[in-house]
């Protein structure tokens, strides 16, 4: 899940960029409160985005003030105060990281050492937020079961991850949750799974690992897929998700920070999709540029 949901920073207002960074620090502090300091190493902007939009949907304003922390011990910076929603998001972040490394170990990749860093934090999540741990565990188990069927359906392949985010939104939003919020987070979760699968196309092809895009289209590489006629189908899949996100947003009321939420959802996700479809990674580094640089 990690690394794909980002703001389109050149189009952020200064106030929104300040808020975005402050909420990133807030989630970091939330992780430390619930799971301990070592668990902060798994912090991602993906969960920061969830903090932005879920505080908004719950109608809860975020209090920000200058503070010091372990990382910024000399110079203070703007940080969001930690509330119960932030703590829940910190628990979600830690559970996701722990299970990610568990999955890496099962796939034969290195991950045991890294997982140890999050073991104590994960145990705290299980004790204090068992519902969050259950949501993550059961949906990831369903994801594993689906992938073992070797389905070539993109919808079926992404369903468990999409449901995981939708289930968490129901839990975190409480009485503010409704069909439109569930549809929104389902579409976001589906996008995350599919953009990750597309990004991993070449790696999975080389390893012989499961990837729905490989089974559905059979191209030799990600770039070969995008350059072919089938590339238009892939683009259509993502455009359909963007439509679903816009449709869900049109039915929701945002009390605070609408500009930041819209930037991430309506500009950030399409930007990241374009980046991956052009052959670059999530950070915008392209293989072709790397090769040219070596020459």
What are these regions (language model features)?
Residues 1-183, 190, 194-241, 245-257, ...:
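Acidic catalytic motifs of isoprenoid enzymes
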Residues 278-295:
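Mixed-charge, low-complexity intrinsically disordered regions
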């Amino acid at each position: 899940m990690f690394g794909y949901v980002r703001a389109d920073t050149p189009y952020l207002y200064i106030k929104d960029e300040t808020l975005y960074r402050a909420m990133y620090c807030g989630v970091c502090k939330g992780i430390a409160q619930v799971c301990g300091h070592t668990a902060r190493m798994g912090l991602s902007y993906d969960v920061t985005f969830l903090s932005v939009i879920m505080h908004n949907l719950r109608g809860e304003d975020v209090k920000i003030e200058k503070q010091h922390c372990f990382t910024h011990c000399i110079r203070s910076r703007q940080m969001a105060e930690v509330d119960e929603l932030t703590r829940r998001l910190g628990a979600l972040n830690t559970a996701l990281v722990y299970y990610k490394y568990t999955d890496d170990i099962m796939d034969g990749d290195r991950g045991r050492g890294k997982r140890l860093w999050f073991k104590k934090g994960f145990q705290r999540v299980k004790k204090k937020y068992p519902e969050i741990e259950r949501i993550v565990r059961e949906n990831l188990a369903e994801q594993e079961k689906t992938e073992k069927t070797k389905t070539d359906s993109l919808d079926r392949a992404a369903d468990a991850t999409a449901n995981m985010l939708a289930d968490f939104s129901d839990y975190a939003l409480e009485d503010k949750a409704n069909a439109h919020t569930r549809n929104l987070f389902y579409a976001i979760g589906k996008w995350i799974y599919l953009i990750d699968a597309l990004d991993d196309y070449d790696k999975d092809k080389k390893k012989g690992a499961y990837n729905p895009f490989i089974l559905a289209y059979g191209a030799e590489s990600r770039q070969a897929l995008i350059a072919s006629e089938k590339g238009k189908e892939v683009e259509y899949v993502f455009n359909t998700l963007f439509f679903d996100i816009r449709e869900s947003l049109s039915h929701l009321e945002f009390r605070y920070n609408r500009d930041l939420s819209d930037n991430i959802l309506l500009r950030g996700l399409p930007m990241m999709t374009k980046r991956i479809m052009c052959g670059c990674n999530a950070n915008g580094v392209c293989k072709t540029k790397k090769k040219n640089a070596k020459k």
